[in-house]
Amino acid sequence: MRAVIQRAKEAKVTVGGEVVGAIDAGFVVLLGITHEDTEDDAAYLAEKIAHLRVFEDEDGKMNRSLLDVGGAVLSVSQFTLYGDCRKGRRPNFMAAAKPDHALPLYEAFNAALRERGVHVETGVFGAMMDVSLTNDGPVTLIIDSSEKLGNR
């Protein structure tokens, strides 16, 4: 499971001209799911994201977490995070999980964030979405559950 995390001042996702999810300060999380992912991967990423210390404290140091600042997450499913661009000019998406496997894990990830006290807004799984945000920093991180310690 792969997450691209962008610290945002505000963000929203629109489907068919209608806003379906919006947050003020927090993270936009683009989440990609692969075939081997499980609910353990979802829980690992949720725990990591809820506690990442990338918000500034009173001294201007990145020392506060999403929970510390009362931030929210705008969670957007993104199968293209598993695009393989090594060969040719068209990405290969064979590593991305099919919807019947990915949707329950996407929902488990969002539920795991909520269980940790994070307010979560979402896009629409599988839909064409317009995502807009005001980057804060910018701060952008990539976390892959396959790279967690003890998993090498």
From Swiss-Prot:
- Main localization of the protein described in the UniProt heading: cytoplasm
Instruction: Fetch the CDD domains from UniProt.
Output: Dtyr_deacylase
Please give the Gene Ontology molecular function terms for this protein. Answer: D-tyrosyl-tRNA(Tyr) deacylase activity; Gly-tRNA(Ala) deacylase activity; Ser(Gly)-tRNA(Ala) hydrolase activity; tRNA binding
Can you supply a Gene Ontology BP term from the record? D-amino acid catabolic process
What is an example of a Pfam family matching this protein?
A: Tyr_Deacylase
Which top EC class applies here?
Answer: hydrolase
Listed A to Z, the keywords are:
Cytoplasm, Hydrolase, RNA-binding, tRNA-binding
Which reactions fall under this protein's catalytic activity? glycyl-tRNA(Ala) + H2O = tRNA(Ala) + glycine + H(+); a D-aminoacyl-tRNA + H2O = a tRNA + a D-alpha-amino acid + H(+)
EC no. given is 3.1.1.96
Q: Where in the cell is it found?
A: Cytoplasm
Give the highest taxon in the source lineage.
Answer: Bacteria
A Gene Ontology cellular-component term: cytoplasm
Q: Where is this motif: Gly-cisPro motif, important for rejection of L-amino acids?
A: 137-138
Complex formation: Homodimer.
Q: Which HAMAP family match?
A: Deacylase_Dtd
Concerning its family, UniProt says: Belongs to the DTD family.
The record comments on the domains as follows: A Gly-cisPro motif from one monomer fits into the active site of the other monomer to allow specific chiral rejection of L-amino acids.
Identify the NCBIfam families for this entry.
D-aminoacyl-tRNA deacylase
**Could you tell me what this protein does?**
An aminoacyl-tRNA editing enzyme that deacylates mischarged D-aminoacyl-tRNAs. Also deacylates mischarged glycyl-tRNA(Ala), protecting cells against glycine mischarging by AlaRS. Acts via tRNA-based rather than protein-based catalysis; rejects L-amino acids rather than detecting D-amino acids in the active site. By recycling D-aminoacyl-tRNA to D-amino acids and free tRNA molecules, this enzyme counteracts the toxicity associated with the formation of D-aminoacyl-tRNA entities in vivo and helps enforce protein L-homochirality.
Please report the name of this protein according to its UniProt entry: D-aminoacyl-tRNA deacylase
* Annotated organism of origin: Geobacillus kaustophilus (strain HTA426)
Lineage here is: Bacteria, Bacillati, Bacillota, Bacilli, Bacillales
